[in-house]
């Protein structure tokens, strides 16, 4: 969802979804506030709906579709969408678009080949998510999948030499504890379990997906920082590689079955909904996060966990016990704490230590950091790029 929400496309879109421009200071704050609330709603629905729709489609009675074909179709649709967006950027001039793609994809082939690595990982991640969601309850997957924040943070420290605040390290520990509690509840659950589900395989798939998501997101960020290509061009290149690699994976894993039963075997409206969500969800988030800050994205993740849990109870008969509630609560709190901007943390710590006071700036000293015109404090630079809320 990778889409890279949950998959490659989401992560890829998120990697390039850097807030670009703020509203003018004199513009109406009410309109911007509405956009932020709309952004929150879109992020919550996209995060929860992809997981729930995959779970629903994979547990429906009848012929089960091939997950590898869904991954390929999502990559094809994502690539076509990015191609149309680039076509619109060239004002509908086919010649200009062809010349641009020839220069960006073929002439600068080194930059193009660099995207083969994250594309391979995103394709693998998308397939792993189908395995995980097919073997775990949607709510359990949603909570456990937040380990991607931990892996992304660790890869950012190792590959980008980023530093984390003490609060962020503490929130990562809290996150790991919450996920461990949820998995302990899953392993010790006494309720009925479908015979075709393997929680151990589901957990292994989630962990592998989180590791791949963290590495690919940070690697993709490094590529974006070292080049001038637009996010739509990079997603088109990812889509080209993703389609090719997805077809190789399809042939390797399910080639004989697909050849005998057909590429679209088992496709229903629910399956097409999953494919469309995977293809367009990440691109939609890339546009939405222009109006979202880290706190909003962390809040969206927390709400999507709650929404997934409630929907799982209604749709799939998920049993909510105190142990799961405790673990999920720790994860929600950890996500929120991790997304807090450092400026806000320092301000809270300073206020609690010294109490309310009026601070006067000494002469000759630079002014303290101010709220931006968007109303947000300075945020962690890598979080909007590498951690995509799903």
UniProtKB/Swiss-Prot annotation:
Q: Which residue ranges run through the membrane? A: 3-23, 37-57, 65-85, 97-117, 140-160, 169-189, 200-220, 238-258, 269-289, 315-335
The source's superkingdom equals Eukaryota
Q: Which UniProt keywords apply?
A: Antiport, Golgi apparatus, Membrane, Sugar transport, Transmembrane, Transmembrane helix, Transport
Give the record's GO CC terms.
Answer: Golgi membrane
Identify the Pfam families for this entry: Nuc_sug_transp (PF04142)
Task: Give the way it sits in the membrane.
Answer: Multi-pass membrane protein
Concerning its family, UniProt says: Belongs to the nucleotide-sugar transporter family. SLC35A subfamily.
Entries under NCBIfam families matching the protein: nst
Subunit details: Interacts with SLC35A3; the interaction is reduced in the presence of SLC35A4. Found in a complex with SLC35A3 and SLC35A4.
Q: PANTHER family from the xrefs?
A: NUCLEOTIDE-SUGAR TRANSMEMBRANE TRANSPORTER
Q: What is the protein name stated in its UniProt record?
A: UDP-galactose translocator
């Amino acid at each position: 969802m990778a889409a890279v929400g949950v998959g490659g496309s989401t992560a890829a879109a998120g990697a390039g979804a850097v807030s670009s421009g703020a509203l003018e200071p004199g513009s109406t704050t009410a309109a911007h506030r509405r956009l932020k609330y709309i952004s929150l709603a879109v992020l919550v629905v996209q995060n929860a709906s992809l997981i729930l729709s995959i779970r629903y489609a994979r547990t429906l009675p009848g012929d089960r579709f091939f997950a590898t074909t869904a991954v390929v179709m999502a990559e094809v649709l994502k690539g076509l969408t990015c191609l149309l967006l680039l076509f619109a950027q060239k004002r509908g001039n086919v010649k200009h678009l062809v010349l641009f793609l020839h220069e960006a994809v073929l002439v600068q082939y080194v930059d193009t080949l660099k995207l083969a690595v994250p594309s391979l990982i995103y394709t693998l991640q998308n397939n792993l998510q189908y395995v995980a969601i097919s073997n775990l309850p949607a709510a359990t997957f949603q909570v456990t999948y937040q380990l991607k924040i931990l892996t992304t943070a660790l890869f950012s420290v190792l590959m980008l030499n980023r530093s984390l605040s003490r609060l962020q390290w503490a929130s990562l520990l809290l996150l790991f504890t919450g996920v461990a509690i949820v998995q302990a509840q899953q392993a010790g659950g006494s309720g009925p379990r479908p015979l075709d589900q393997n929680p151990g395989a589901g957990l292994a798939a989630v962990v592998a997906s989180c590791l791949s998501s963290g590495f690919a997101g940070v690697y993709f960020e490094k590529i974006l920082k070292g080049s001038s290509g637009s996010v739509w061009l990079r997603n088109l290149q990812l889509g080209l590689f993703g389609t090719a690699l997805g077809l190789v994976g399809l042939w390797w894993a399910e080639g004989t079955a697909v050849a005998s039963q057909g590429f679209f075997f088992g496709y229903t409206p629910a399956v097409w909904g999953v494919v469309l969500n995977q293809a367009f969800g990440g691109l939609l988030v890339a546009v939405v996060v222009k109006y979202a800050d880290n706190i909003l994205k962390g809040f969206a993740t927390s709400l999507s966990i709650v929404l997934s849990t409630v929907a799982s109870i209604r749709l799939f008969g998920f049993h909510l016990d105190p142990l799961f509630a405790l673990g999920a609560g720790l994860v929600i709190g950890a996500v929120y704490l991790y997304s807090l901007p450092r400026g806000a943390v320092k301000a809270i710590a300073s206020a609690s230590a010294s109490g309310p006071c009026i601070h006067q700036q000494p002469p000759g000293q630079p002014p303290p950091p101010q709220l931006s015109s968007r109303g947000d404090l300075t945020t962690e630079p890598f979080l909007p790029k590498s951690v995509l809320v799903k």
